[in-house]
């Protein structure tokens, strides 16, 4: 009898670390993207929580009128926010060591830049980690592609828009009321409701909700009975079972008769691709719209476009929206400038007799 002894090479510490990082057997997959994702998202989350609770007021407009955003300075969950970095800083990279003191850094809104830049890097790494895990499991890469839509939207409002406007102070505040303020000011300055890419985004989000509800209700209504009346229908499914849990033919027949035949998918794969692609493409377009409006390529302007035979303006909904935009623009940053840009651009009449 012959015994064969294998000599096992001792794995280095670095090799063991690499194997652990890339192992799909871990309870939570780390991955090389995760090595960067974990510290960046932890940093963004930690600073956000601390600043939301205790950050002092920030001179957002750069005019020595600080705006309070934290809970300890009089706000609640609804009104609180991380106030964007001061207009006095503009687009400058503003880490703590660039300020003369921590107090100055806080006064100029340094935490906003820190949170946003770490957050954007972190969510990109999360997207890369989705692709990495899919690759290692032999899956197709579409999960990461779908996640690129919210990543693009976050990038548009937190990075591209400030770059186009010339200051991080124009970025979206990190809070509920701050988000609404950002939306109102964006409409006032860029007429986003009249931009076709925003319209596509609305169709994507609301259409995606509708299709999700339609699909879920159709599947739930055409489950194959596996239980009695006294049991939950959910008990009729076992994780990993090979047979279908619902009758797609019945669902197809129902919906085809409810609308018309070709409104109903007869292929489960193309149906689920459609459910993923519709909202993703819509949000891509909205992100692209924000990114173009960042550089002042704004929504359609149909103001005073309808006149009668005497040249008198016949007001349309476009004119109503324009009046609302002017009102919103007058009210925001009211101490930073006396007139909205649209009014300030008009040449003043001569007062010389």
From Swiss-Prot:
Residues bearing the modification Phosphothreonine: 2
Ranges annotated as spanning the membrane: 29-46, 118-133, 142-156, 197-218, 274-288
Keyword terms of this UniProt record: Acetylation, Calcium, Chlorophyll, Chloroplast, Chromophore, Electron transport, Herbicide resistance, Iron, Magnesium, Manganese, Membrane, Metal-binding, Oxidoreductase, Phosphoprotein, Photosynthesis, Photosystem II, Plastid, Thylakoid, Transmembrane, Transmembrane helix, Transport
Pfam families noted in UniProt: Photo_RC
Binding site residues for pheophytin a: 126
Residues found modified as N-acetylthreonine: 2
Residues at which chlorophyll a PD1 binds: 198
GO biological process, one term: photosynthetic electron transport in photosystem II
Protein name stated in the entry: Photosystem II protein D1
Source species taxonomy: Eukaryota, Viridiplantae, Streptophyta, Embryophyta, Tracheophyta
